[in-house]
């Protein structure tokens, strides 16, 4: 169960263009030289963590060791079915969400990391830049 599942976004160096959370949900917009990727979580998310990529070096190193560094570097958006972040949310809520199949989603760019815990798949829209 503890595996990384990528979403096969077009290859490229992405940056975080926008992160928005409001009544309508959570939107992540990633941009590369060739593409714009919009990731929409239209419902409730159980946790959201946005950080500078360099601020989580220990965890990033653990992921590279566990999932293979080369694969990690090729994935801009992925999910982990079992993670320390999911366990943290479970502990902090005294197991309130344990009956749900929570997933740990990660948008990982060269500069930023956005992590979301949700029980459903997001909608992903990929547009070629003009």
Per-region residue spans from a language model:
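Surface-exposed, interaction-prone regions used to assemble/regulate multi-protein complexes
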Residues: 1-130
């Amino acid at each position: 169960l503890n595996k990384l599942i990528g979403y096969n976004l077009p290859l490229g160096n992405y940056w975080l263009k926008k992160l928005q959370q409001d009544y309508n949900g959570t939107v992540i917009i990633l941009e590369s030289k060739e593409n714009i990727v919009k990731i929409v979580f239209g419902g409730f998310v159980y946790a959201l963590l946005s950080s500078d990529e360099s601020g989580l070096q220990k965890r990033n190193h653990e992921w590279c060791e566990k999932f293979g560094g080369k694969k990690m570097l090729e994935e801009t958006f992925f999910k982990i079915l079992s993670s320390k972040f999911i366990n943290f949310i479970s502990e902090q809520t005294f197991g309130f969400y344990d009956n749900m199949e929570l997933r740990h989603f990660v948008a990982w760019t060269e500069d930023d990391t956005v992590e979301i815990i949700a029980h459903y798949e997001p909608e992903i829209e990929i547009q070629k830049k003009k």
